[in-house]
Design a protein with these regions (language model features):
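The feature marks the mature, well-folded catalytic cores of soluble enzymes
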Residues: 1-327
Length: 327
């Protein structure tokens, strides 16, 4: 007899929605994430197709460069690349990333809808904020990505994962700027892609589980938190202190989190990796100095070539949305 039949009673429900036993019995799994480094179980990805050819030549400006910077005169660096990606190489590198995740025990769920694919759908991280018990779907700030949420809702529902909410109204929020820090704490970075109304909606949904949300103001030069902060072990984080406020650095110190600074000699998106399990990280192979730093500090690194992927304006973290982690 299926375990859910044990709940066939007219007794009032006394457990909260996120009760692990209830989730596993009714929804098939505990779903969601309580911490950012637990062993990956399921990850949502999208293998890039011909949709990427719809982008303009300087496509990286759309994803990694804040649109606000287009209104500022003068010389400054933005995270763009001077050429469009080669689709065949892009697919090969994406496949290699997926293979690396499978070797770490992850099941890949593909978001495939090439007929209706949006140009930047490869960056599945932005589709939602995965929290204990389910996902909060994003509302994108740019029209070029706006339709991705509908496709994500369909695929995530098909997988059987609870959708706990969706950013609505005039709120905007994207998953690349969100992470669970521990079972009681989450962090969101505010930028032109994540506004106060979006943060308020995330905070309200998290409050049902008693989870505190820390909102970090990001500089105008970046759009997502994952360009500046990545947990790599239970008590270790890779950071770019030039992109984070002092009080957040102090908050991490107060939690006894050891901070490792991404090497400025490495490519910009070196920090944009993913923890496959505690102390084991998949990282861009081009970030040799940072890889050396991580290795010397007890973090195992699985290098993957993303030289073509970054031409789209994103990295490894951007291409992966874990739906379930251990712990």
């Amino acid at each position: 007899m299926h375990e859910s039949f044990s709940y066939m009673s007219r007794t009032l429900v006394t457990e909260p929605f996120h009760d692990k036993k209830l989730l596993e019995s009714i929804w098939g799994k505990t779903w969601g994430i309580t911490n950012p480094v637990g062993k990956v179980k399921q990850i949502l990805m999208h293998r890039p197709g011909s949709e990427v050819n719809r982008l303009e030549k300087y496509s990286a400006q759309i994803e990694s460069g804040p649109m606000l910077l287009n209104q500022i005169k003068g010389n400054f660096s933005i995270n763009s690349m001077p050429q469009s990606p080669d689709l065949e190489r892009l697919q090969q590198q994406h496949d290699a990333l997926a293979d690396a995740l499978r070797k770490e025990g992850a099941e890949i769920i593909y978001l495939e809808d090439h007929e209706n694919a949006w140009p930047e759908m490869m960056f599945t991280r932005d589709l939602g904020m995965v929290v204990p018990g389910g996902v909060i779907l994003s509302r994108f700030a740019l029209y070029i990505r706006y339709g991705e949420t509908r496709l994500a809702a369909q695929k995530i529902s098909e997988a059987g994962m609870p959708i706990l909410g969706m950013v609505q109204g005039m709120g905007f929020a994207e998953g690349g700027s969100f992470t669970m820090l521990d079972p009681q704490t989450a962090v969101v970075g505010t930028s032109e892609r994540v506004n106060a109304a979006g943060v308020d909606q995330i905070r309200q949904i998290l409050s049902f589980q008693g989870i505190r949300l820390i909102a970090v103001d990001l500089p105008a030069s970046i759009i997502h938190l994952d360009e500046a902060f990545l947990m790599v072990d239970q008590q270790k984080a890779l950071v770019n202190i030039s992109l984070l406020p002092f009080w957040f650095i102090d908050e991490l110190h107060s939690r006894d989190i050891e901070l490792l600074h991404v090497d400025p000699r490495d490519p910009v998106l070196t920090i944009n990796g993913i923890a496959a399990s505690p102390g084991r990280v998949i990282c861009a192979s081009g970030g040799s100095y940072t890889i050396d730093l991580l290795s010397k500090n007890g973090v195992e690194v699985i290098p993957v070539d993303i030289s073509e992927i970054v031409k789209m304006g994103g990295g490894i973290h951007c291409c992966t949305l874990p739906l379930e982690r251990k712990g």
